[in-house]
Amino acid sequence: MGKLFRWSNLCYNDEGLLGMRGVDMKTEHQMPEFMRNHYTLKALEVLQKKKATLFFKRLFDICLSLMLLVLLSPVFLVLSICIKLEDGGPIFYRQQRITTYGRVFRIFKFRTMVMNADKMGPLVTQDNDSRITKIGRKIRSFRLDEVPQLINVLIGDMSFVGTRPEVQKYVDAYSEEMMVTLLLPAGITSKSSIEFRNESDKISKWMDQGLTADEAYIQKILPEKMQYNIDYIEEVSVAQDIKVMLQTVFAVLK
């Protein structure tokens, strides 16, 4: 029990490198004011009963992310060289995203677009987006641009499975019920990621009907995606995470 207690302290300590950042269940009064509502308080009660599950989920994240970072180091090297050779720009794309309780962090992704792409168009990206580089298009086809997020998982900004981290602009558009998803760390993948893996096609269809890319995402795509993420709160478990991760692999390889 002593060893488990020490591991628990590590995993729930915000100051530790591998701490349980964002999964240290806050009380109602500790929760940020913008999140506090009927939906989040009800979900908080559910998660308070799953502390052991959340501990093992974090432990799973630490062990697997560390192992994959070692195993995939050759992939990191090859892709880094390819990205650098194409236009000489930075290897990683770092953007501010939102995770647990509205905390801002910087996500790691392999850069697949031209430099300063976020200043040249909408935040959402379509498959035929002219800002995507040649090597970037190939990287995106296998979702390899997400691989560096293993670093975010290891340090506790993210989990393998959870709501995809949004930029502040889209979090500002959350309904009260959507705030529930900020009770757990953002994730690399989720059921909604699988169901909306062709998200850009859906956005294009709405744009054909007169909406901008941002309007299509906020008004049409986001509400549907978030319902999957809200449901995840009730069923969170390591077994469920493994299932979603395997489904993600199969979806990418299709």
Give residue ranges: language-model regions.
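Short, positively charged and aromatic/hydrophobic N-terminal segments
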Residues: 3, 9-13
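C-terminal terminal-structure detector
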Residues: 23-26, 183-254
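A short, structured surface patch at a secondary-structure boundary
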Residues: 126-192, 245
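Short, glycine-rich, amphipathic interfacial segments at transmembrane boundaries or analogous
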Residues: 28-36, 93-131, 192-224
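Residue-identity detector for glycine
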Residues: 2, 16-22
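Positions in alpha-helical segments
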Residues: 65, 80, 93, 133-137, ...
